[in-house]
Amino acid sequence: MNETDIEGARVVVAEACRVAAARGLMEGILGHISFRVSPDLLLIRCRSADDTGVAYTRPSDIRLVRFDGTAGAPGELDNGYQVPKELPVHVESMRASPDIRAVAHLHPPSIVAADLAGISLRPIYGAYDIPGAVLARGGVPVYRRAVLIHSTQLGKEMVTAMGDRPVVICRGHGITSVASSVQQSVLQAASLEELARMSLAVVSAGGTLVDIDDADWEDLPDLGANFNTGAVWRHEVARAATV
């Protein structure tokens, strides 16, 4: 990527942080999103001495770093900027596949609560959120250690638990969502958080969680990227600006 592309990507990652915060997927100063710009360089949300939280992320908070945590270019870690302690979440996820360019490590409360309650996220609804139902149909794995993923070894453990799925629940912690785009990594997380919220509500009301009928999948089409990502993302960005 050239310098212009990198600057544009900073804007997108910062935007994604604000969207995730507005959606309640991360709170306060916790959580981070990244985007790979070359085989060993990524843009990632870093903290600084004047950080006011993820909901107020600026493009200048998105810093270019190497996979080893050092500055990716002169000045990138100046002015008190620090790489997240859980950088291995991002690095090991990206190392697992060249198709993974974006990683969102978030703390969605309903997902954490549902997992702790022993509730598996399954496709209990269809047209309410087709991408979310499809995601759940393939299964959502769980990394069963409630640790800060601050080492290469722990990052590899998480990636192993994730397997070939785009999202893994980190028990008592949060989730990691991976995708080819920053937007998709956040939208996947938002869909699963809504599914978890709905599942908790059904169980709390005394209901039973049941997968939709197999026959219904024939009439749950892929509405395409222009709708599922493009239109939805424009809404999320506009919504985040008003929260």
Swiss-Prot record:
A matching Pfam family: Aldolase_II
Record bears the keyword Lyase: yes
Keywords attached to this entry: Lyase, Metal-binding, Plasmid
Reaction catalysis annotation: 3,4-dihydroxyphthalate + H(+) = 3,4-dihydroxybenzoate + CO2
EC nos: 4.1.1.69
GO cellular component: cytosol
Active-site residues, as the UniProt record annotates them: E86 (proton donor/acceptor)
Cofactor: a divalent metal cation
Annotated binding of a divalent metal cation, by residue: E86, H105, H107, H173
Keyword Protease in annotation: no
Description of what induces expression: Expressed in phthalate-grown cells.
Pathway: Xenobiotic degradation; phthalate degradation
GO molecular function, one term: 3,4-dihydroxyphthalate decarboxylase activity
Top-level EC class as recorded in UniProt: lyase
Family affiliation: Belongs to the aldolase class II family.
Name of the protein this chain belongs to: 3,4-dihydroxyphthalate decarboxylase
The organism of origin for this protein: Rhodococcus jostii (strain RHA1)
